[in-house]
């Protein structure tokens, strides 16, 4: 059953959607097809693309100055070494922008190629209002709708590695 308006449900968000995670059916929506910048929600699509191109969870990465991005302070410093798994958790638990860039570098793709794969993945899911300009979500050009975010978030949560990381409340990084 779809609930399209319920006076007892007060939603303060400009756009929202509630879906049945098993069926994908919309249970409630409010301006769910209106496009907005999605900020760090972009990291879910980046995580999907990384999982598809993962060189191995134990792959060691040396953090670079060029990985640093504006936003929250990174948990890793230039020259420090860290596993792909720890970078993945840093990106999804702490929403570390630099960790996402490091994961991009670990795939061997350029940032532009990685973003192209994010957009290709969106198209393959039938998402027509979702566009990515960068993997971190710092770009206001990363846009989607609540309805389309629900689609790719659902796909992300079907991946055990992504689901586990996103549901983790805290994570201790190990520098190598």
Where are these regions (language model features)?
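Active-site-adjacent loops and short helices of periplasmic peptidoglycan-processing enzymes
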Residues: 1-147, 151-160
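Conserved active-site loop region of the serine DD-peptidase/beta-lactamase
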Residues: 158-176
